[in-house]
Amino acid sequence: MTKRRVVVGMSGGVDSSVTAWLLKEQGYDVVGLFMKNWEDDDDGEYCSTRQDWIDVVSVADLIGIDVEAVNFAAEYKDRVFAEFLREYSAGRTPNPDVLCNAEIKFKAFLDHAMSLDAEMIATGHYARVRERDGRFELLKAFDHTKDQSYFLHRLNQAQLSKTMFPLGEIPKTKVREIAAQIGLPNAKKKDSTGICFIGERPFRDFLNRYLPTKPGPMKTPDGKVIGEHIGLAFYTFGQRKGIGLGGSKDGSGEPWFVAAKDIASNTLYVVQGHDHPWLLSRQLVAGNVSWVAGEPPADGFSCGAKTRYRQADAACSFGRADGERFSLAFDDAQWAVTPGQSAVLYDGEICLGGGIIEFAATGQPGQTAPAPAAGHTGALAEAR
C-alpha cells in the first residue's frame, strides 16, 4: 500500500520538527521542506538562516525523512515585503505574517509541495482544520494561549483542503515534552518572535534601511507642540515606549501614547493616559476582505473579533458594506484599534475570516470616515 505523502514546512524550530515526527509516526511518507525567504544579511547577528537549516537537517536525520531547501526570496519581496513598505509609507501598521501565510507558506510553498507529488502539506501552526458538509473550517487551537488562527484567516477553501495542523490539539507544553523525549537536537530552542523571516533585529533600525526619516512635530490634542518625531512610519497607535517623552513634565504626569497621525501635515499626535478617548473605538471599517468559506457572514451577525493577536474575542455585530469592505460595531470600546492590522472574526471556535482595518472611530474630533455599512450609523456617522 502506497503511503500518503505529506510535505512539512520545517523552520528549524521545535513546532515544525515535532509536526514532522508525529506524521512519520502516523505512517505518512513525510518530506521536509525548508523555506529561505530572505536574502539580505544572512551573515548578520539577527538572521539565523544557516543555523536553522543545520537544525532542519539534524532533525530530518534523526527521524528518518528526506528534506530539501527552496528559495522563495523573490516571491516574498514581491508579494509581502513590497506591500509591507507601502503600508508603512502610508502611515499604517501592517502585519506581514498574515500576508506571508496567505502568499508564501500556503501558496508558493503549497504549489512547490504539489510538484513533489504531495497529497497534503503540514506546518507547525497552532490551529485546526475541520471538514463539515463538504466545506473546510478553520478552528482555533485547543491551546488558546498559542492559537494562531488570527494569522491564518486569509486561507481559502483550496488551501485548507490540502493542509494539516497536527499541533492543533496538543498543548505547547506537551510539544516541548515530545521534543525532549525523542531527543530532538533543537528541543530547547526558543520560539521565534521577530517579523516573519526577517528575524529579531531592532525593528526601527531595520525599517530605517528602507524608509527615509521625515521628522515632524509631535503634538497634544489641543495642538501644543511637545516634541519632534523622526517619521510617522516609525510609530504605531497605542505605542508607549520609544516616543521620547518619558521625562516630559507636561500634562498630567500619566504615560504618553501615540494616538493619531496626520499624513498631510506630517504630525504625530500623542495623548496621556491609557484610557484617553482618542485611544478608544467602538466601530471600525475594514477592507481587503477574505472569508474562509468564500462568503461573508449575514448583515447584523453577532460574532467575536480580534483587532490584534492574543486579544480576547470582543463581542460585536457585523455590517456588510460592499464586496471589499465591512464594518464592526463593538459592545465595548476597544483600545488602540490600528489601521493596517487585521480585524479577524470568530463564531465561537470557528475563524470566519476578516479584513485589513482602514478606519476606527475614536474620540478624536474631525475624523473622516468611510461610509458605514448598513445599520452601523452611530460613531462612524458622527465622525464624518
UniProtKB/Swiss-Prot annotation:
Keywords: ATP-binding, Cytoplasm, Disulfide bond, Nucleotide-binding, RNA-binding, Transferase, tRNA processing, tRNA-binding. It catalyses: S-sulfanyl-L-cysteinyl-[protein] + uridine(34) in tRNA + AH2 + ATP = 2-thiouridine(34) in tRNA + L-cysteinyl-[protein] + A + AMP + diphosphate + H(+). Belongs to the MnmA/TRMU family. Residues 146-148, 308-309 are annotated as: Interaction with tRNA. CDD domains: MnmA_TRMU-like (cd01998). GO terms for molecular function: ATP binding; tRNA binding; tRNA-uridine 2-sulfurtransferase activity. It is found in: Cytoplasm. Catalyzes the 2-thiolation of uridine at the wobble position (U34) of tRNA, leading to the formation of s(2)U34. One of its GO terms (biological process) is tRNA wobble position uridine thiolation. The gene is mnmA. Its EC number is 2.8.1.13. This is tRNA-specific 2-thiouridylase MnmA.
